[in-house]
Amino acid sequence: MGNYATLIGESDGIIQLTTWNVGKWDGKLKIGDYALISPGVRILSAKMITIGNSCMFGRGAYVTDSDWHGVYDRNEVAGSPKEVILEDNVWIGDSAIICKGVRIGKNSIIGAGSVVTKNVEPNSIYAGNPAKFVKKLDEQEIIPRKNFYSNPKKLKDDFEILDKLALKDNTLFGWIKSFFYRNKDH
């Protein structure tokens, strides 16, 4: 895991970063600097998944380098894995699926709910099932996520504002009440 990663977990959106290291399988996962990983993201490796700098993952996105079972022999562990590479500054939308053997070019965006089975050109938007080319992006206009960290004072102030907004409805009375009138999900 690189520097300045932001992982946002929730009780109903646990983040799963898994490498499968059994027998002939030696999964590896490399995540670059400034990654943003939202609730429910699953990244599962039986071979190698490389994620570049400033990549962002929407809620429930899934990246895998394996089928996890053979096509005919469902007991065959991990099928035949193929490396996955996400170059720098890639944005994977909510619930998108990135399949084995895929390379996503730098600055590209994958639309929510898309299923990516083939390589994606740099500076492009792809969407759909299967994902198809939608639009070319102007590389000169793209501002990478790492720029968010260029002013530490502003970053600290911004996070304090976000914390206040997230917690504004919390009160001492509400906290005490939660002990006596528990939500059925908690």
Positions of predicted regions on the chain:
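C-terminal segments of enzyme domains that contribute to small-molecule binding surfaces
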Residues: 26-27, 33, 76-99, 129-186
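Short arginine-rich
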Residues: 118-123, 153
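Conserved active-site beta-strand element of glycosyltransferases/polysaccharide synthases
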Residues: 126
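Conserved catalytic segment of ABC-fold P-loop ATPases
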Residues: 105-108, 121-123
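Flexible, glycine/small-residue-enriched loop-and-beta-strand segment within the central core
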Residues: 1-102, 137
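A generic "structured core" feature
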Residues: 109-111, 115
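Short cysteine/histidine-rich zinc-coordinating motifs and their immediately flanking basic loops
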Residues: 12, 121, 139-141
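Short beta-to-alpha loop/turn elements within the nucleotide-binding domains of ABC transporters
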Residues: 102, 114, 120, 129
